[in-house]
Amino acid sequence: MSKNIDWDNLGFGYVETDYRYLSTYKDGKWDEGGLITDSNVVLNECAGVFQYAQTIFEGLKAYYTKDGRIVCFRPDLNAIRLDESAERLVMPKLPEGRFIEAVKEVVKANKDFVPPYGHGASLYVRPYMMGTNSVIGVKPADEYQFRILTTPVGPYFKGGAKPIKIRTTDFDRAAPHGTGHIKAGLNYAMSLYAITDAHNQGYAENMYLDAATRTHVEETGGANFIFITKDGKLVTPKSDSILPSITRRSLMYVAEHYLGMKVEHRPVHVDELKDFAEIGLCGTAAVISPVGLIHTKDGDIHVPAGMDDMGPITKKLYDTLLGIQHCEIEAPEGWIVEIC
């Protein structure tokens, strides 16, 4: 029985659900973990997460398919990425298989919060890990919590995705050889000033450039870029300081194996921006957000696809990946994980 929620008017924000998952790391090992009902986290004031930002997270969705199943999309890649993030911040990896089993457990427990099929909504699943014991000197914590919260969210774009205006920026999202390739809370904190400034100037997002030379495209504060050339190729930026987006990897596969497109994953110079036919941002929340204009220090670049609608090739990519996620198009093996 679904909760008494107005699914048609559900926003993209936090709604507390009944259960969350908790596992604790202490004395060099993880406990068995399990579901809890308390949504509050109580920690010592000197916990590593507070003092030195030792926290990482993931994001994925659970949703109903047309035939009444609840599924998730490629959670194995979220598990791998969380492990990679943990290693970089000197945090313990989870026991093998724990991530997916925990996701299944918490989604099943909160299945009444999974929006009905056809509303464009989903149950957002947020796994995260943090250092929890008191740490006054700069060093890794000794104790950790791995938690998963869930919250029902409406469609990222109500009424469909309309092209947005973005800008290039001299702010840096990540340093060379830094933490840009992992999903750490500190990366997102660094982007808050820049995104607030962008919004104040009338832009939806920042296009970060490489910190060393300011000549190559990186990503935004929370999404990878995709570019469509005038001859129909999909191009995605390559850099060691870009977060390896699961949505971007999936779109590259869809482009090549479902739509027969040529795909290039390579460094993208800023001088190329004026030559692309379509530009978009990709990520878990919106799948693809089309870009219609890029403001640069040399002037505005008007993307040929325009400011009215998503470009035709971007739309095919969007519709195909969405169809795969919702089991309306046959998925590659292992992409769809059934919860219940």
Which residue ranges define each predicted feature?
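Extended, Lys/Arg-enriched charged tracts that mediate electrostatic binding to polyanionic substrates
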Residues: P115-R126, M130
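Helix-start/capping segments and mature chain N-termini
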Residues: M1-A102, V106, V135-C340
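Short, charge-rich binding segments
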Residues: D112-G118, V138-P140
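Intrinsically disordered, low-complexity linker/loop segments enriched in Gly/Pro
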Residues: A109, G131-T132
